[in-house]
Amino acid sequence: MLTDRQLLILRAIIDDYIQTAQPVGSRTLSKRDDLTFSSATIRNDMADLEDMGLIEKPHTSAGRIPSEVGYRYYVDHLVEKQIIDERETGRLEERLKQSSKESEILIRQAADLLSDLTNYTTVALGPNSQMETLARVDFMPLDERRGVVLIVTDQGHVEHRTVMFESRVAPDVIEETIRLLNDRLVGTPIGQLKIRIGEEVAKLQLAQRQQYENMMQLIQSTVGIQTPSSLYLGGKKKIFNQPEFQTLDTLRPFLEWIDEQERLTHWLESLPNREIYVSIGSENGIVALQNCSVITSDYTLDGKTFGTIAMIGPTRMNYRHGVQMMGQIIEALRRTKLDE
């Protein structure tokens, strides 16, 4: 159990190190207006904090830096619960609304905004479209032999495929086929569409089958492609701005990891569903992130849990600001309506 004085000193050490990236000594702390203790008292408490594993001495300096344990204590006990700034959330909501009504563009914009607000790299994971349900099927003709099939999901995800007819198909046949599919298949999970369209073809009477079977089968072929969760990356190069990532030995593992989209997607999908959470260094369980902290949260659009967004920075990240900005973005996304 830390004394009130030790809490103040630990907070001051971490706050100072976050700002300067330089080890902190007792002399530096004694000059702070918010610490009215002598250098000797501060040195004694710093020795106790080091014995508890909350701070550590780097090889090349007389000062101290936070340890992973220290950062965890700081995040759990010294980072105050942030209150949503209604004015800031409103501004972010307006910026998201101006970007698009399509979920993919909104999520990408949210990732970019969060990166700009924090100066950290961000990753946003959209839903796996196979887990969504069909909202509607549309068709846009390009010419007499070609057109684009649009599959729109309940969460605003849009998949489009260009199709080519072997021979000209009458516009009324196309229109009626789309109507039949929408009447019978809206609400079907995307992953089951291929089977369901086949079932609907089998139900058609002979006269209908001659008219609509080819068109239905053509549309059926477009939904057979498995679509992974959408992944959006913001501010990838911002890691270059951090003093901890100025050498190839520290930078290369991070860049190689973040460039492997399949592995990155799997990692985000494996995170437990929860509100804002901070994982620090080795807690991430990934070698490339051993010098990083990650702030993650689920987010919602139109009242539905939509995906996960993560902010990645050094373990020396500004946790207060990061948690605050994550909360603002999550709230702005929650308030944004796709159909307005």
From Swiss-Prot:
HAMAP family hit by this protein: HrcA
InterPro entries associated with the record: GAF-like_dom_sf (IPR029016), HrcA (IPR002571), HrcA_C (IPR021153), WH-like_DNA-bd_sf (IPR036388), WH_DNA-bd_sf (IPR036390), WHTH_transcript_rep_HrcA_IDD (IPR023120)
Originating species: Exiguobacterium sp. (strain ATCC BAA-1283 / AT1b)
Source superkingdom: Bacteria
Keywords attached to this entry: Repressor, Stress response, Transcription, Transcription regulation
Protein name: Heat-inducible transcription repressor HrcA
Biological role stated in the UniProt entry: Negative regulator of class I heat shock genes (grpE-dnaK-dnaJ and groELS operons). Prevents heat-shock induction of these operons.
GO BP, sorted A to Z: negative regulation of DNA-templated transcription
Entry annotated with the keyword Transcription regulation: yes
GO molecular function, one term: DNA binding
S-S pairs: none
A Pfam short name: HrcA
PANTHER family tied to this protein: HEAT-INDUCIBLE TRANSCRIPTION REPRESSOR HRCA
UniProt similarity note: Belongs to the HrcA family.
